Amino acid sequence: MIRIAPRVGLAAAAVAALGLTRNSSDRIPTSDTSVGRLAGPSANAAALSRATADSADTVTQVSMRKVNFYIIPRAALRIRTLRGQMRSFKGGPVTFDDKNAFVIHLDYAEIGLNGNDITALMNSYIFAYPGAPLKHLRVHTSGSQVVQSGVMHKIVDIPFEIRADVSVTPEGLIKLHPVRTRIFGVNGNDLMRAFHLSLQKILDLSKAKGVTVKGNDLFLDPVRILPPPAIEGHATAIRVDGDELVQTFGTVDALPPLTPPDTSSGAYMFYRGGTLHFGKLLMLDAQMQIVDLRPSGFFDFSLDRYKEQLVAGYSRTLPDLGLQVYMLGLDKLSSAGKVSADHLSCSRSTGASQCDPTSSIGTTPASAWPKNYHVTRISPIY
């Protein structure tokens, strides 16, 4: 007979109740190259695809440095470095206006997620479905470990906290191995052993996006846990760095370096080759570098709001007909005020150089600009 002290009676009863319903066994997925359900391009993008069907180069090379790439309003991929390729699912242009229509392949990347990013992903995407077994989740780092707390729901709601070691499997999955579990504030490991339970028997994760369980270990597919745009890549390492969980994909020498026109910018996105489509613009044999209009460390960017960022900035054409785009960082949009629908771009009357990219062109009245600047009115591109 198992003796249970009165102080753990509530926790024991809850854990025992969890054992009444057992889900079918979960299997750890092997290397999975799928990127979820693929949505076809819009009718407009399809027409553009036909128009460029004769082009043999449908892949766009991409390089990023120090970019906070927002995938949902409260979660970003903290891209330290990225070298990869982009392509449309249907061939033809990569269309920025349809993030379901293209994929980013990571040949090499170092990408961080902080506790707030993971928390938002867990609650707003991974477990955002009716009847999810986990809710009200919070995640943070502690030393070299990850701490997750929240509510486990089966028959009753059970508050829990799990402290876990983190590693990468040969298949490229993120493995969370619990080293301490608290249920109702008491030792959850002892309770689960007493009732011959495991997380695999307790949690039905069949509807969760990119998460599986085996025994007491949780496995996260680092690309399937993310909303669009789709990402392909094989995680090769993971570490805790301050408040971030930093993932390494691929190998640093997988592709040759891709050097942007402006090497002085520490934070940028650079696209080269293939065909890019955004707003009303179609760029063949693309060469476009995007930098922060007011640089201050990492560049905050969102596909969902890139038009606002673009309209608040300006662009210039380079001598080789490439495009240099100065966007206002997402974090600065709220402080920029309402942006007029009639915007200004400028170039020096001599044509020798362009506007200072560190100035606030998008919000500064033309009357305040230096006299040696030539002012041209342009309309938004969308």
Regions found by a protein language model. Name each.
Residues 10-18, 37:
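Hydrophobic alpha-helical targeting segments used for export or membrane insertion
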Residues 1-9:
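Bacterial N-terminal signal peptides that target proteins for export
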Residues 15-30, 45:
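Bacterial Sec-dependent signal peptides at the C-terminal "C-region" and cleavage site
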Residues 29-382:
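Extracellular/lumenal and peripheral-membrane lipid-interaction modules
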